[in-house]
A protein has these predicted regions:
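Polybasic phosphoinositide-binding surfaces of eukaryotic membrane-targeting domains
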Residues: 9-21
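Acidic, Ser/Thr- and proline-rich intrinsically disordered linker/docking segments
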Residues: 1-3, 9, 24, 29-88
């Protein structure tokens, strides 16, 4: 797998190389696939969702609108393929 890069909002970029997920924008956060799980909330009344990255008892939340959520689909599928539990 090559490097996957997805814009997750106007000031946020998410990259995944098959082993490490990195979130850029503000502070940089890194997640290893062996320690990561992901939950995705259902859409609220405005179509917004919350993608939550869980690692070692810490949660990092990525609030996204519907177009951004659609862009994240390839990333969520790649995470699932790497063995990351993705719920929602």
């Amino acid at each position: 797998m090559g490097l996957l890069e997805v814009a997750a909002g106007p000031n946020r970029m998410v990259t995944f190389d098959g082993r490490v997920l990195e979130v850029f924008g503000g502070s940089v956060r890194r997640f290893h696939v062996k320690l990561l799980s992901v939950t995705v909330s259902g859409p609220d009344k405005h179509g917004n969702r919350n993608v939550v990255l869980h690692q070692a008892g810490i949660e990092n939340s990525l609030p996204v609108n519907e177009p951004t959520y659609e862009r994240l689909q390839s990333l969520l599928e790649a995470l699932k393929s790497a063995g990351v539990p993705v719920v929602g």
